[in-house]
Amino acid sequence: MLRVYTQLERGNQWLKQYEGRSPIFACVLGFTETGLIPNVSTAGATPADRSLTALADAEFLFNGPQSQPTYPLPDLAQGVSPAMISWPIYTSQNFPFQLFNAGLRHSPPVPTVDLRGQAARCLSSGMALPLPIVELLFQQGLEWGETLAKQAADGYLILAECVVGGTSTAQGILTGLGFSVAGQVNSSHPVCNHQQKHQLVEAGLAQAGQQDWLAHPLALVAAVGDPMQVVVAGMMITASRTCGVMLAGGTQMLAVYALARQISQIFRLPWTPDNLLVGTTRWVVEDPSGDTVALANQVGEVPLVATQLSFATSRYPQLQIFEQGFVKEGVGAGGCAIAAHLYQGWQQNDILNAVEQTLEDYYRLRDPN
């Protein structure tokens, strides 16, 4: 049900250590105007849809299927929101759950911890966020990482994200940190929009001017990042000192890991790399139009683990389409599937049945006739 793709010894040791332990599930919401660019993401069929995706996902993650949500899940080009995977798992297994608002355009319709951030401009501007906001969000991340780690006790944290356009800002961070990532990142598209991402990143870094980004990683986030990245980086650093941390995502969380490592070096912040893992889905890792394993190896140190969950036998075409490379990941879907297996031994059919039941309830409530 699980496979370790990089750093095999460290990855298997982490999985063994946290087998049978209950995690705390935290999802950090953010927004970047990068997500409004035509065709940049499939997390919403139109830019108008994508401007509300994080709000709809947050509402679904908190409430599950409802007859009249404030923000209905947006119609996707293909497939369904990955919140359809995360919600039934964390609620069935009673993971404590917390939503964090790192920077959204609108107030979420459900309870969140407001970190006093703001939505980011498009990364191509080279001025995505004001530096003081980035510094504030990082400090908030450090403090909340400590708090969540205390609550986790001998368990671990699942740190997830919801940022439409977030793989593009991830490419911006990785490029600024000196990694050669062309062709390696993923997206919600079945075939990754590499050229579009590359042009956005090059424009953003050019607008920001020549800087020593390795010496100024927070300034790099201010230039081409998004508000989620620096929050999760802060959480990761402090939480890793005392408990396990699963960064739940693919490209975006590899970028967060690389960012956090650089920040910790520059600011001499102690952290514990052995307590960290990146957890995602097979759909991300096996995406032929990206190369997550090569990216993880290039970033180095952190184990990359993926659930082997498949929707090939689902009775719903909206789930089968995941096998063609649509959607792939988001809001901790892969991390929750990994945790479901670790904590209660859930197998393929357990997860598939839970997700299909959620989808059935969703459609029944949405269209009772």
Swiss-Prot record:
InterPro entries given in the database record: Nict_dMeBzImd_PRibTrfase_arc, Nict_dMeBzImd_PRibTrfase_sf
Alphabetized GO MF terms: nicotinate-nucleotide-dimethylbenzimidazole phosphoribosyltransferase activity
Top-rank taxon, per record: Bacteria
Coiled coil (residue ranges): none
Residues passing through the membrane, by range: none
Family to which the UniProt record says this protein belongs: Belongs to the UPF0284 family.
Protein name per Swiss-Prot or TrEMBL: UPF0284 protein AM1_5137
Organism whose genome encodes this protein: Acaryochloris marina (strain MBIC 11017)
